[in-house]
Amino acid sequence: MLLSEWISFLLVAVPPRSRRTFVELLIGCLLNPEGWVTRAIGAIRREAHWTTYYKLIERAQVPVTELSLRLLQLVLTVCPTELVTLILDDTLVLRGAKSGPGISIKHDHSHKANRPTFLNSQCWVTLALVVRVRLGSALTVPIRSWLLEESGQRGKLWVARQLMDSVRG
């Protein structure tokens, strides 16, 4: 399959009004090795005002569950396998700001050198698909991530369960 066919496959999950903006952001993410949205916007020649990109993401104008299912289907079509291996991982993303979505002081279990035990950060739980490419080697394709709330009843295990349920077919 060609890249254009991959994009067309994913666009089925995107409302027609949002498709152009979605493709611009997707291409920006492909051009940018870090994957950050702000870098993706900087990597493209913007055809729309920055608020258009903000609204697409922040207001969830793209159905994330449907898009993640399409991505999973695409990867399984391109790399067919009998055994599907999904992994769940939680990641702390350090933040300088004191307030924002999901930002709070969290315990860092990684015990990295020159890093305090408690960090001002966000916690993301990610569901990914492991794709075997060669004997003994594999790629990991992130399917969907979920920002953990800074407080409340929804812990990492609850979020992990929701992520698994969202791709169960």
Per-region residue spans from a language model:
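Conserved, well-structured functional cores that handle cations and Mg-NTP chemistry
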Residues: 1-169
